[in-house]
Amino acid sequence: MIQNHLFQILANLAMEPPPRTDSESIRDEKVKVLKAIPPLDQKNIVRGQFRGYQNEKGVAQDSKMETFAALQLEIDSWRWKGVPFYIRAGKCLPVTCAEIVVRLRQPPTMYQGFNLTRNDFRLRLSPEVTLAFGMNVIAPDRITSANARKW
């Protein structure tokens, strides 16, 4: 799943606007994204197997087949420089879903020195399509604190 579906979603999310809306222009922009991913460092890759997988019907008792993979990568471009992308996929996880979570850069410390969390947005593609936002909220009359909110 990581090598096809999730990279396709990553390319769609991170590509620059194509000069035209024909399929070749869109494909070219996606290819630019994929080519801008530097080689992965082993310390940014996690692989595993869910407990009990070797007891599944048709699975060898000594199977080393991964049922989970997670990786952190970056895209070497002006827009995404320094923004980590996390891709995870696996079987038998606590939540069954396909989603994209984008954590935006840390806000500047211009808001009266508040220790602000990073804003994010979440696009869940399955089991149902939802869009959620997590952001810092500073009420006009509150000058001493900020609250992280999720919608």
Where are these regions (language model features)?
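Secretory/organelle targeting and membrane-embedding segments
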Residues: 1-151
